[in-house]
Amino acid sequence: MLSVPDYEFWFVTGSQHLYGEEQLKSVAKDAQDIADKLNASGKLPYKVVFKDVMTTAESITNFMKEVNYNDNVAGVITWMHTFSPAKNWIRGTELLQKPLLHLATQYLNNIPYADIDFDYMNLNQSAHGDREYAYINARLNVNNKIVYGYWGDEDVQDQIARWEDVAVAYNESFKVKVARFGDTMRNVAVTEGDKVEAQIKMGWTVDYYGIGDLVEEINKVSDADVDKEYADLESKYTMVQGDNDAETYKHSVRVQLQQYLGIKRFLEKGGYTAFTTNFEDLWGMEQLPGLAAQLLIRDGYGFGAEGDWKTAALGRVMKIMSHNDRTAFMEDYTLDLRKGHEAILGSHMLEVDPTIASDKPRVEVHPLDIGGKADPARLVFTGSEGDAIDVTVADFRDGFKMIGYAVDANKPEGETPNLPVAKQLWTPKVGLKTGALEWMKAGGGHHTMLSFSLTEEQMEDFATMVGMTKAFIK
């Protein structure tokens, strides 16, 4: 389900006519070469298209207008090969409505001491041309990104690639539609928020639906469709009957698959890319969606439990940014406070994303007291090890805030035979005590998105693009 348009990024370089036509042709040739080699590097997830050498305010303004109305263009990359008077960039930059990357680089990565002359100096002026251009962006309070270094170096290309993913996620953020099945968990504070402001700032549309609307769609799913999904499930996961008799086990799994197909069809009909559930709102449903939710999250839908639409929308954005790679809905569940073992055990009742599994997930059926419904099927697995980030978004009186930190993710020290859920252990890199204290001081909630694929820098870049306050704990 996670499909993204074939976006591209338009690349322009700044100059001025006083250098002469031959020099401007040389500037264009160098810029085209950079674009070609960036594309050939295999590093960039989206194509860079060199458009032109920008020499006048009129050409820059017209270019930015063209960027805005081309839906296949996700953003702009600029470079000042020579000195480009920055007043020329004011109007166009103010009109730009898409992400902007200033690539502060130089065509050649060395100083040719034996051959350097004023012709070379006049043509290779990035050292001060990029400063002139950066000044006007700072003066205009543009939420742009600056990547500094030689364009041919892998670390610079990696930075551009990561920014491209953020820029695409920004564009796709304005297409995020969240279907709320039921309301938020009663009397919970942090899952609330200003939906109008969220649509203005991040583009997130949030709509409420009664459970009866969803149940009607679920009941339309045929046995034949469930049979097909059951066979697919058997091919991908380990089916564990456990203490259940065969008929009870199969029925429970089939109920979840019926929910999976019903929810998916409901979302597809409405163009929704994320959803929430709430164990307090289950009218007409045999089970709380567990396996159903996990399969939808696996497919790329954003998800939030207990009506948490902010985390659902954030999850969708992060899945786009990460190409749906090891990025999962999570909750801080319980703690290990022993000296030398400090850690958070993250989980949820049923809905943790199998993209972070380190082992082959098992389809199991167990009782769940919360919700008061029949025993739900769910995927049970252990999370992964490695560097990751944990991020949340909360709403305050003065706007939205993104809170996050880097973590060391690990597998639990032991088995949990009496806790048949998906689980992930982690410790904030700043330490559990510091991390937890600063998280709570910042007002971070208990629902988060954990990602092994994304970086703090990328999430900070996204927050900057949408004008969100940032509180990253370092």
Swiss-Prot record:
Gene3D superfamilies: 3.40.50.10940. Binds 1 Mn(2+) ion per subunit. Its EC number is 5.3.1.4. One of its GO terms (cellular component) is cytosol. It catalyses: beta-L-arabinopyranose = L-ribulose. One of its GO terms (biological process) is L-arabinose catabolic process to xylulose 5-phosphate. Keywords: Arabinose catabolism, Carbohydrate metabolism, Isomerase, Manganese, Metal-binding. InterPro entries: Ara_Isoase_C, AraA_central, AraA_N, AraA_N_sf, Fuc/Ara_isomerase_C, Fucose_isomerase_N/cen_sf, Lara_isomerase. Its cofactor is Mn(2+). PANTHER family: L-ARABINOSE ISOMERASE. Belongs to the arabinose isomerase family. This is L-arabinose isomerase. It comes from Levilactobacillus brevis (strain ATCC 367 / BCRC 12310 / CIP 105137 / JCM 1170 / LMG 11437 / NCIMB 947 / NCTC 947) (Lactobacillus brevis).
